[in-house]
């Protein structure tokens, strides 16, 4: 009898251990988020929610009627259409853009987002789709600023985010008199026009568009970029399925000429990376 009870206890112990191990395995799988249905969630919702700074022309900004337009917006609309959903555009506070993405307030960050190491630690990126440089903009009459080295002792303006990070990592930041940070580039340009700062550090695509459209007496300091950058689309690290599909569609758009057409519309040339 004792032998039977002992055998029963052993079998019961093994059975219970197996159940516990199985439960741990299931829990780990769920908490790790290995079942990625991010693309299907977008399809079920019927929309792709894009987060942006709606002052970042020409990537995503408000036109005279208040509608949000831009190069990235046109790309995203086409991608959403090919997925089979609508595009919802959601302006966000760019200084907390990654938080908005990871909280689930938006599905993608798509607004001239610079790919850098600090962001890659928090989110995933699509393939780079655009090359960009961080450049210096000055008033046309400032003959004392002709190179990066001339920024020593000057008051500089920069938007909070990747541009701010890039400037801070450059040795010239330690030689500047002051670095003023702005939520949006437009406010930096307003201070430049009012001579409250000496130069603005900004993405080249945004600078060239602003100077052309606003007809301001600003110029780009030639042959003196602070960095070479790449733009990508930001995704939550769990949303690999959605990222893969967006990359596939963007490759498809490059191959069929759609990306080139959109680029011609906004930049008068095809600048999309092949």
Locate predicted features.
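Flexible hinge/capping segments at coil-to-helix
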Residues: 41, 126, 139-156
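Short, low-complexity disordered leader/linker segments with a strong preference
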Residues: 1-45, 272-274
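Periplasmic-binding protein-like
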Residues: 54, 131-138, 186, 208-251, ...
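A ligand-binding cleft/hinge motif common to bilobed small-molecule-binding domains
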Residues: 96, 113-121, 169-170, 191-194, ...
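Ligand-binding cleft/hinge of the Venus flytrap
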Residues: 76-85, 164-182, 211-215
